Amino acid sequence: MSDLKTIAQPYAKAAFDFALANKSLDQWAYMLMTTAEVASQPVILQEIKEIDFKGAKNAEAFTQMFLDICEGLLDEHCQNFVRVMAENGRLIVLPDVLNLFMEMKADFERTIEATVLSVEPLTEEQKVNLVKALEKRLSRTVELDCQIDESLVGGMLIKAGELVIDGTLKSSINRLASSLQA
């Protein structure tokens, strides 16, 4: 786990536990997406990196500006969450907090997103069959994210969490080439 993820972990856990206890997982996911998006903007990110948040008056002003940008999109609890993160100089990890929160949410809801790369668009029947097979293998509800990647030559590449199924023609050709060179 990267340093930023390590720092983000307790914040993500606190947000998740609070959201779960208050039956507001979807609302918190949206609010954290908002804060992560704001924190990822180049101008804001630069300020986050430069400000000393430990008791500085300009840090309070920056935090208020940050919350003003999110005006109407964060409830009181999420605003307090952002303030606590700012007081501890941790706004830089908001994107990591979001990612960890979403992992916890997906784990709790027993869902997983599977990214499918193929040369041509999948038919509805192929999508249905793929979802059924993945749900059986992963024991989770699967949401497909189908993308076109013409560099694959043929076949498909499936990524779901830590599972990677490489059924591409490109991969088969590379394995054949490796075995011929051995």
Swiss-Prot record:
* SUPFAM superfamilies reported for this sequence: N-terminal domain of the delta subunit of the F1F0-ATP synthase (SSF47928)
Compartments, record wording: Cell inner membrane
Organism domain of life:
Bacteria
Q: Name one Pfam family in it.
A: OSCP
Q: Which PANTHER family match?
A: ATP SYNTHASE DELTA CHAIN
Instruction: Name the job this protein performs.
Output: F(1)F(0) ATP synthase produces ATP from ADP in the presence of a proton or sodium gradient. F-type ATPases consist of two structural domains, F(1) containing the extramembraneous catalytic core and F(0) containing the membrane proton channel, linked together by a central stalk and a peripheral stalk. During catalysis, ATP synthesis in the catalytic domain of F(1) is coupled via a rotary mechanism of the central stalk subunits to proton translocation. This protein is part of the stalk that links CF(0) to CF(1). It either transmits conformational changes from CF(0) to CF(1) or is implicated in proton conduction.
State the protein's name.
ATP synthase subunit delta 2
